[in-house]
Amino acid sequence: TEPKFVPATAAKIKVEDFTANIRMIDCVGYVVKAAKGYEDENGPRLVMTPWYSEPIPFTEAAEIGTEKVIKEHSTIGIVVTTDGSIGDIPRSEYIEAEKTVIEELTAVGKPYIVLLNSSHPMLPETEALADSLKEEYKVPVMPISIEAMQERDMYNILKESLYEFPIEQIKVNMP
């Protein structure tokens, strides 16, 4: 449940004419209720965190870690949700966690995009869902199969992410 920086030190990347040092932060996110593993036969699974000296419920640790990543460590958010085609959990089970993280990113003013993970990202119904989410959240939503992702897809995700930063200054040098 403790967020991890990937890689531990920033990697230099180039997207078109823009060069940046980036690190991604991998965190659990908000728990999807139909998921397994956050409870055991005794009730909520307890985990140790860097924030408390005693174990706390996994769901609470996941929420605290995600909030800290959003508020204290991130510059931009990449929200990953799904159409439900990637496993045994239907789309409807993801919506509450999806809305929670998007509301939090919006409230703190962090730029973000949404990846719609799908085993069939090019199908019309997947594209229609992406359009619906784009309309609802007012941010770019990219249908993608994360399992089949290529280097070019990552480039496109980073490029789309950069467009979410507000322009604060334009400088023109004229001879």
Describe the role of every protein-language-model region:
Residues 100-113, 118-175:
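Canonical P-loop GTPase G-domain recognition
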Residues 1-110, 147:
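Switch- and interface-adjacent substructures of P-loop NTPase systems
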